[in-house]
Amino acid sequence: MSKIRSNIKVMIFLVFYRFIWFLCMPLVLFYLFSRSKHEPAYAAKLLERFGIGQTQNGSWVWIHAVSLGEFRSAIPLVDKLVERGERVIITHFTPAGRAASEKYYADHISSGCVLVHWVPFDYRLAFKRFFGRFKIKYGLVMEVEFWPGMISSARALNVPLFLCNGQYPNKSFERDSRRYFSSRDI
């Protein structure tokens, strides 16, 4: 019975979350365009954030490294995957992370085994487009940058997600499990 209750809580939360995203999208776009006045990269390739772009051949391993710090911790992982012959797409939310990724992997990008991309906005259609364009085998999420839309989209589209270099201390897990709704439910 508790599994059913948990699923209902997740469904209610996701409906509410998606509705909030829909309402807040103009604010999110305003934020990106405002930031782009000082850092033009925030608004560059904006369609990527909606999951729109050119479809790529083959399947890809997705590494989600939001910012510069996450990217730095992902470097050994990306290197090992490329050594094994995997094609890797790295997503970022911040221009600093993206710029560092593009610079560090310039040779791999030109050879076509690494791509750098903005992370899609956290709603299902954007992730559905993204997962479809790259035929994602699985996602490796650095640290604890899981988002509800990302998780539910990956689950709905059978894309396995793995947490890398992240911590969810027992104390936090226990505290969260006592709440009406927690990240544990998702």
Model regions and ranges:
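Short hydrophobic helices that act as membrane-entry/anchoring signals
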Residues: 2-36
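Short intrinsically disordered, low-complexity coil segments enriched in acidic
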Residues: 1-3, 118-119
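Active-site and donor-binding regions of nucleotide-sugar-utilizing enzymes
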Residues: 29-186
